[in-house]
Amino acid sequence: MAASQLTQAPYTTAFALFEALWEAGITACFVNVGSDHPSVLEAIVKGKRERPNAWPRIITCPAEMTAISMADGYARVSGRPQAVLVHVDVGTQALGHGVHNASVGRVPVFIFAGMCPYTEAGEVTGSRTEYMHWLQEAPDQKAIVRQYCRYTGEVRTGLNVKQTVGRALQFANSAPRGPVYVAAAREVLAQEVPPYSLDQAQWVPVGPGALPPDAVAAIARALVQARRPLVVTGYSGRDRRCPGLLVALADLIPGMRVHDTGGSDVCFPFEHPASEGFRLALDECTRDTDMVFLLDCDVPWIPARNPPPEHATIYHVDCDPLNQQIPVSFFPAHGRWKADSFTALSQLVEYIRNDAALARQLQDPEYAARGAAREKVHASRLAEIAAQARLGDDEPLNAANIGSLLKTALPESTTFVIEAVTAAQTLSDQLQPSRPGSWINCGATGIGWSNGAALGVKMALMDLESDQPGEHSLVCQVVGDGSFMCAAPSSALWVASKYEVPVLTIVLNNGGWKAPRNSAQLVYPDGLAAGATDDEINISFCPTPNYAALAEAAAGSGAGRGGLADDDGAWMRGLRVRTVADLKRALEMVESRVIQQRKGMLLEVML
């Protein structure tokens, strides 16, 4: 039967759901559909045909982890949540560590799942029709993800589906931002309802909070009067305006240093002399301070390894200063305030600039000496980092020379999506990210995030560049083989190929997981595992998969060849490299293949 002869689909709860997403500013929906979605499928087709330019873009994702990670990556660039659609309890469970990542990483994502029909005998449209409808009914489906979500809800009637979506998005977009989850049964999704809309101006999130005047004065004076003030941050760079304000603060207070313990965003430019770089809460700078200012930071130090001196003054400003989702979190502070980072930094910079007493104090020659010493230390650190990269053509590859080569070979506009786990800190030292938004890390611990997140980041950048002809920014994913394997890489590679989302992927193949060995050595430095092989402690991936071949096969490009000759006919190109010379030659292809031709490329780096 021709499409024109088909009966026009009714306006249902499912259609109103997608309409609500679009009206709220959601432009993409990453889907993994199932038996709970007949009305959803009808709505998708109806929307595509009747209002193609005012309907979310529907992206098929063979694995749920791909779907939620793509939405996660998109939101980190755009600042706007996107939608994920999965089926019943099993699809919800398959979101797994992706929900953890969005929750811990403070990323807004709207998740929708169908529920099993609640009628058995065809009483209403959507009743049970298949065997699995008795097997997939969980006693409390929302409980699967409730402890990771800012809000969980259920659509019980189509008459208020848009209000339910609006309320969920208010939670997703209010600090601390994070995932929300809404579910609905088949019968409800099939319900016919009259069309309606909401005034979106009345469905806004909670606005940013500011510091009270006494807190501004206390923090500003403590920073200026301290001999070794230290700012420890983690998420503040998610707001791209914050790094510039932190620079202004560091320029006002010579000697102040800034340390990033989360690595999820560029919170402070590496090139600035105040930068202490990125470490996962373990750096000696926290021991060498008399005043610590914690700014949007979950884990500022490891209490058993590098706590600040007991005499240090500690102030904490955060959108969630009590870390309400972390039961054991005992970091002390002499003052805590719930406030927006950008607003708080603006207040502090303005106060210091306009306070006459502080201005006079900062004119003391001692401050100039502190600033000069800070610059000297930073220059020495940069020299030490540069010396770590051995770049002779025959040199084997490691995190230091890989990072150095990526920094010099790729455009300055490159956005790095990093999930290198044990190599991330070394990569940060070598890449030295300074442009806001140029470095994006998960900020959580659900490995495999970057496979989908890099695609979401690139999609968001492509949308931003759509009004700028000729602008084709590069996204470079750097991922360890353990993380790459952990989250259905074939699904992400297929999505990249189908929807032509070009990303340069660097897989660091060190033959397995290295982080568990590091963890064991911290607890049992002389234990049995310390002298055991990787196979004995079950962290080896040997014989190693051929990730270059996997990339080409998953993208439908044929078998991987592992050579260096380009194939313009294939959308995905996979290469294995072993030496500095190999990597240099491979990176020479990136400008033409990934940026200009907008095709995918995966480099498997043998460590």
What is the predicted role of each segment?
Residues 2-353, 409, 474, 493, ...:
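N-terminal alpha/beta PP-like core and its mobile active-site loop of ThDP/TPP-dependent enzymes
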Residues 11, 15, 34, 213, ...:
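Conserved structured core elements
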Residues 14-18, 22-25, 32-44, 243, ...:
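Active-site diphosphate/adenylate-binding microenvironment
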Residues 52, 123-136, 252, 286-288, ...:
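Thiamine diphosphate
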Residues 142, 246, 403, 547-548:
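Generic structural marker for isolated residues within well-ordered, non-membrane alpha-helices
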